[in-house]
Amino acid sequence: MSMYGRDPWGGPLEICHDSATDDDRSRNLDLDRGALSRTLDETQQSWLLAGPGDQGRKKKKYVDLGCLVVSRKLFVWTVGVLLAAAVFAGLVAGIAKAIPRHHRPPPPPDDFTVALRKALMFFNAQKSGKLPKNNNVHWRGNSCMKDGLSDPAVGRSLVGGYYDAGDAVKFNFPAAFSMTLLSWSVIEYSAKYEAVGELGHIRDTIKWGADYFLKTFNSTADTIDRVVMQVGSGATSPGSTQPNDHYCWMRPEDIDYPRPVVECHACSDLAAEMAASLAAASIVFKDNKAYSQKLVHGATTLFKFARQNRGRYSAGGSDAAKFYNSTSYWDEFVWGGSWMYLATGNSSYLQLATHPKLAKHAGAYWGGPDYGVFSWDNKLTGAQVLLSRLRLFLSPGYPYEEILRTFHNQTSIIMCSYLPIFKSFNRTKGGLIQLNHGRPQPLQYVVNAAFLASLYGDYLEAADTPGWYCGPHFYPIETLRNFARTQIEYILGKNPLKMSYVVGYGNRYPKRVHHRGASIPKNGVHYGCKGGWKWRETKKPNPNIIVGAMVAGPDRHDGFKDVRKNYNYTEATLAGNAGLVAALVALSGEGHGVDKNTMFSAVPPMFPSPPPPPAPWKP
C-alpha cells in the first residue's frame, strides 16, 4: 500500500499532469511566427491595400478597437464618462476613509473557551516547590522545598512537580498520564490554544511536569535500575497518629513533617507512562531542539527500563495500591511504544506497539464492561485512537496494516459504544454517561471519553471522511461532537441540579472542595498537623477559591453533596483536570481542526525500500 492510500470515497488521488512535455514547449518557443504562411482576412487586406488618403479619412471618423470599429465621437464620450466615474468613486472612497469608524468588537468567547481558561488555572494551584512569579494564585506560595533532600536514602533534590489532589502527595503515575494528555491536546490543537492566548500557559504547565520527572531518575544515563514513584505518604493505619499527608490537614507551605520518597525497581507501567509523557512533551517543544532531545533521551532510558524490569509499580503494597492501583502494564507498552515512535521515528517502537501478542495481553480482544474506558490506569483506548490517526493520515502499510486496521475498527466500535442508542453504558436521568458503572468519581472518565470522541471526529474530518459505521448504520461526524458536547455541558451546569462541577465557572459551583490549601486561610497563622483539622471540619465555604478545579462529580442519581470530607464528591485531581482541559480545547472555538503534521514531525517518509540493483549482466 502506498504512503497516502486511496480515497475511501472513490476516485484517484493523483494530480493530473499537463500532456505537453518540456521538449514540446521548447520546440514551440523556437518557431519563427513571422515565417508562417497564412491567409489574411478582409480587414487586414484593407489595411495593406488602402491608400494614405483613405487611412486618414477613416481615422477621423472611426476608432478601431481590434475586435470592433466604433465611432470616434462615441469612443470619446464613453472614455469621458468612465474617467468622470473613476474620479467620483475616488472622492467617495477618500471621504469614507476620513470618517471615523466604529469597529465591531470581536464576538465573546464561547462557554468552552471560558471554562478552558479556568481549568488551566487548577494546575497553577497544584504546583509544588519554588513557584514562578506569574503563578497567579495569590493564596499559594513556595512549599516542600526539602523534598528528596530530607530523605537520607535519596539525598538529592526532588523539589517541584505537582500535588496530586487535595493532599500534598506527589504520585508520578497519574501525574505522568496527566502531562501526556495535556501534550497530546497541544500537539493537536496548538492553533486553538494560541487563538485564546493560552499556548504559553499550557506549555509552561507541561514543562513544569517534565522538568520534575527528569529529576526522578538518572535522566543523563542510558541505563537505570530505579525510578521514584512517590513523594509523601498518605497511608494511615487504624489508630495511627503518625503525621503524614492524610493524617494532617495543613497548607503545603506549612508542612514540617517528614516526606518519605518511594522508589521502584520493577515498574513497567510507571516507567512506560513516564516515557510516554516525556516523548509527547518532546514533540510539543520541538522548537527547542536541545530541550526536546533531552526529553527524548530521558524517555528512551525510561522505556528501556520498563522493558527490562517487568512488573506493576503498585504490586509492592505501597500507598499506590490504595490510591492509584495499576491493573496491568501491557497497555502502557502499547501506549508508550506509540509515543516513542512518534517522538523518534524509530520503527522498532512501532513494531512493538503493533505486535499482535502485545495487543492481546493489553486486552484489545477481550471486550468486557470496561472496554473503551480511557483513564490513568488503562491507556489502551487512547493508544488505539492514536494509532488510528497513523493509519488515517500516513497509511504505513505492511507489516503494520493488519493490527492498525484492527485498532481502527475497534476505535469505531468504541465510538459506537458512547452513543446512547446502543446502551453499552448506563446514563443518569440527567444524561451523564456512567463509564465507571455508577461508582464514585465519574467525571474523570467522562471528560476523557469526550476528548477522544471529539478528537476522532476531527480525525475523520481531516481525512475527508464524513462519518463512520456502527454495524449497518452510518453516523455523521457531528454525532461524535454532540456526544462530547452534551457531556461537557452537563459538567458545566446543564444538569438536574443546575450546578457547575468546575469551580469558578458559572453562578453555582462547589464551595467546599476537598483541598487543604483552599480550605485554610492565608492569614499569617501557622496551623499545625492537628491545628488545621478545624478547617477540614467546618461547614463554611473554603476561604480560597481553587479556580478551574473539576470535582469528582455527582452520584449515579445526579445527586451531589458539597461536603469537604466526602472526597468522592468534592475532590479534584490532576488526571481529571487534564482530561477536562483536553476536551474543552477540542470543543472550543470554530474551525481550526487538528494539526495533521506536527505529530509526525520526527517520522521519516514511509516510502517502500528500493529493490536491490540487478546483478551485472554476463553473456
From Swiss-Prot:
GO terms for molecular function: cellulase activity. Its EC number is 3.2.1.4. Keywords: Carbohydrate metabolism, Cell wall biogenesis/degradation, Cellulose degradation, Glycoprotein, Glycosidase, Hydrolase, Membrane, Polysaccharide degradation, Signal-anchor, Transmembrane, Transmembrane helix. GO terms for cellular component: membrane. Disruption phenotype: Plants are dwarf with reduction in cell elongation and decrease in cellulose content. The keyword Chloroplast does not apply. It comes from the Eukaryota. It catalyses: Endohydrolysis of (1->4)-beta-D-glucosidic linkages in cellulose, lichenin and cereal beta-D-glucans. Induction: By gibberellin (GA3) and brassinosteroid. One of its GO terms (biological process) is cell wall organization. Residues 1-74 are cytoplasmic. Ubiquitous. Glycans are attached at N218, N325, N346, N409, N426, N568. It is a single-pass type II membrane protein. It is found in: Membrane. The chain crosses the membrane at residues 75-95. Involved in cell wall assembly during cell elongation. PANTHER family: ENDO-1,4-BETA-GLUCANASE. Belongs to the glycosyl hydrolase 9 (cellulase E) family. This is Endoglucanase 9. It comes from Oryza sativa subsp. japonica (Rice).
